[in-house]
Amino acid sequence: MPAPPSTLLQSWNRNAQAWIEAIRTGAIESRLTVTDQAILLAVLGRQPERVLDLGCGEGWLLRELEKRAINAVGVDGDATLVEATRAAGSSPVHLATYEELAETTVNIGSHYDLICANFALLHQDIIPLLAAMNALLVPGGALVIQTLHPWTAAAGDYQDGWREERFAGFKGQWQPMPWYFRTLSSWLNALDMAGFQLVNLQEPQHPQSPVPQSLLLVAESRR
């Protein structure tokens, strides 16, 4: 089921309001118990002064960084999410698609100590985007990615390819969303080709769960 980037963005346009409600009401248990804390600790562990939240969604991570006096900037491709983020916090937030970011046709600032993408890299061709993000980092700056753990999400089909999220078990009105599954080696190859070196790999896990809740990658720019 090939899905162009525009189709993925359209699905976010349709699901934005439901997503805002789900995050702000704490409806996603794995985020409350494991993954929100995992990405926050990974970011704070680098002691950054300036952070870009790539695909910031409704802005929860920006607000957490604001509380800690970190200079944080957000960017997202959906106008509803950007508006919600701006209304709920004071961090600057840019409206830009990943294609615009990859082609460097928009200015979202530079000299970031760290760029994070929390469950925000769902399209197929991520290498141009990651390479563009690399150029926005200070020398030796870090990229922190949290994503679905490929060994958990594979569902018996461990190969790169498009999947469909139907939001089963979520409250509210949701439309199915395409997303691109990639294996662990595919993630590592993408980082390497975009000019990054992996320095840390984590598998956040709930103590009562037999499987990891996510995959968390920390990579440094080779510039």
Regions found by a protein language model. Give the residues of each.
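A short acidic, Gly/Pro-enriched loop at the edge of an enzyme's catalytic core
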Residues: 104-115
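Short alpha-helix
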Residues: 178-201
